[in-house]
Amino acid sequence: MARIPGRPDYDALIKLLLVGDSGVGKSCLLLRFTDDMFTSSFITTIGIDFKIKKVDVDGKLVKLQIWDTAGQERFRTITSAYYRGAQGIILVYDITDEASFNNVRNWMRNIEQHASDNVNKILVGNKLDLAEDKRVVSIARGQALADEFGFRFYETSAKDNVHVEEAFIAVAKDVLARMEGEHANQQLLQQQQLSAAQPVRLTSGSPSPAQGKSCCR
C-alpha cells in the first residue's frame, strides 16, 4: 500500500541500545546486522555510535535506531543518558571472556538505575565462531543467567553471521508488542474517561424525585 506523502515511511520507530564490556563485539554485531559486513580491525568505539535499519516485524515496517555504546568504564557517564530513551537493550558478553560474562551483572545494575522500568532486554553471548577452541562460558551458564533475569538468550557470531538477525528481530518484536499493548491500554483508558465525563440526562418521560411515592401514610 502506498504511503501518504508527508507521513513517516515506517509504522514504528524503535530505539535499541547495545551494551557490554569493551571488545565483546558490539560494533561487529551492529555492522553485520545493518550492513551485512564483518571486519576484525574495528577501533574501539569512542563514546556513542548508531546505525539505522528498517525491518519487517510481523507485517509492520519498523525503523530501528541502534546505538552502540562504549564499554570502557570512563565512558559510563556518557552512555548513562542514552539508557533513558532506549526501548530495547541488547546486553552482550564474549563467550571466550569470563570477565565480560561476570560483568553482565554490573551492566544490569546500570540498566536498572538508568533505563525505563519496562524496557525490553535480551542477553547475547557473542563470538560463537571461537567456541570450539576458546569457549570459557558454556551455553548452559548463559541460558541460566538469562533465565534468572527473565531475558531471551542467543549465542551469536558476527563473523559467521550466526543468529545475529534473529537476536535483533527478537528484541524488536518484544518492544513492538509492548508498545501496541500500551497503546491499546491508553485508548481504553481514554474511552473510559470519556464515558465517565458524559452527563446523565433524564428523558421527558422520566418521573422526577418529587413524583415518586411518598413514604408517609
UniProtKB/Swiss-Prot annotation:
A motif (Effector region) lies at residues 42-50. GO terms for biological process: protein transport. It is a lipid-anchor. The keyword Nucleotide-binding applies. Its main location: membrane. CDD domains: Rab8_Rab10_Rab13_like (cd01867). Residues 198-217 are annotated as: Disordered. GO terms for molecular function: GTP binding; GTPase activity. Residues 201-211 have a biased composition (Polar residues). It is found in: Cell membrane. A lipid is attached at residues 215-216 (S-geranylgeranyl cysteine). InterPro entries: P-loop_NTPase, Sigma_54_int_dom_ATP-bd_1, Small_GTP-bd, Small_GTPase, Small_GTPase_Rab. The keyword Membrane applies. GO terms for cellular component: plasma membrane. GTP binds at residues 20-27, 68-72, 126-129. Keywords: Cell membrane, GTP-binding, Lipoprotein, Membrane, Nucleotide-binding, Prenylation, Protein transport, Transport. Belongs to the small GTPase superfamily. Rab family. Protein transport. Probably involved in vesicular traffic. This is GTP-binding protein yptV2. The gene is YPTV2.
